[in-house]
C-alpha cells in the first residue's frame, strides 16, 4: 500500500512576537508549545501566514521556555512581521496499511493573540471496517486555566 504523509502536530493561529532577519534560518518557538504538540528541535515545519498569505517551510529551534515566543528567522523573517498570525504544522511519514489498522493521532494547539492556549485538540483517525473515521476531540483538561 505504501507510505502516506499525515499531519502530526499543529500550532494554530500563533502570533509572531519578533522577526529576526539576521539569524541564519529557522523559526524559534517556545519549547513548552513544541512539547505540547510533539514537535522536535530541527524538525521541518510548513508555515502559513494568515495575515498576508505567505506559505513557507523551515525548521524549528527551541526558544526560552514559557516566553510564548514565535520568531521567524533569516529569510522567513522577511515573510512575517510581529503581530502576524501563523499556522505551523508538521507531517510524519506513515505506513498506509498501519494507519488503516491502528489509526493515527495529531495534536493541535490553538492560541490567542498573546500565544496563550485557548483550545487543544486531538485529531484522530480511528480504524473501521471500510477505512477510517475522523474524530476531532477537544481536550479541555489539557488547557491551562
From Swiss-Prot:
Keywords annotated in UniProt: Autocatalytic cleavage, Cytoplasm, Decarboxylase, Lyase, Pantothenate biosynthesis, Pyruvate, Schiff base, Zymogen
Q: What is the lineage of its organism?
A: Bacteria, Bacillati, Cyanobacteriota, Cyanophyceae, Synechococcales
Q: What is its EC number?
A: 4.1.1.11
- Native organism: Synechocystis sp. (strain ATCC 27184 / PCC 6803 / Kazusa)
What's the cofactor?
pyruvate
Where does the chain bind substrate? 58, 74-76
User: Pathway membership of this protein?
Assistant: Cofactor biosynthesis; (R)-pantothenate biosynthesis; beta-alanine from L-aspartate: step 1/1
Q: What's the chief localization of this chain?
A: cytoplasm
User: What are the annotated GO cellular component locations?
Assistant: cytosol
Pfam families recorded for this chain? Asp_decarbox
Q: What is this protein called?
A: Aspartate 1-decarboxylase
Q: How does it assemble?
A: Heterooctamer of four alpha and four beta subunits.
- Kindly state what the record says about how the cofactor is bound: Binds 1 pyruvoyl group covalently per subunit.
- Major enzyme class: lyase
- Describe the reaction catalysed, as an equation: L-aspartate + H(+) = beta-alanine + CO2
**UniProt function note:** Catalyzes the pyruvoyl-dependent decarboxylation of aspartate to produce beta-alanine.
Q: Where is the active site?
A: 26, 59
HAMAP family with a match to the protein in the record:
PanD
Q: Give this protein's Gene Ontology molecular function annotations.
A: aspartate 1-decarboxylase activity
Amino acid at each position: 500500500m505504501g507510505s502516506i504523509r499525515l499531519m502530526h502536530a499543529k500550532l494554530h493561529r500563533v502570533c509572531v512576537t519578533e522577526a529576526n532577519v539576521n539569524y541564519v534560518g529557522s523559526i524559534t518557538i517556545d519549547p513548552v508549545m513544541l512539547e505540547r504538540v510533539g514537535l522536535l528541535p530541527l524538525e521541518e515545519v510548513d508555515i502559513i501566514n494568515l495575515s498576508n498569505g505567505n506559505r513557507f517551510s523551515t525548521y524549528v529551534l527551541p526558544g526560552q521556555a514559557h516566553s510564548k515566543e514565535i520568531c521567524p528567522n533569516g529569510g522567513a523573517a522577511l515573510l512575517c512581521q510581529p503581530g502576524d498570525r501563523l499556522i505551523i504544522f508538521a507531517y510524519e511519514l506513515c505506513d498506509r496499511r498501519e494507519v488503516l489498522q491502528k489509526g493515527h493521532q495529531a495534536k493541535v494547539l490553538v492560541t490567542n493573540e498573546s500565544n496563550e492556549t485557548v483550545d487543544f485538540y486531538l485529531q484522530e483517525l480511528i480504524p473501521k471496517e471500510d477505512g477510517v473515521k475522523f474524530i476531532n476531540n477537544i481536550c479541555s483538561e489539557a488547557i491551562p486555566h
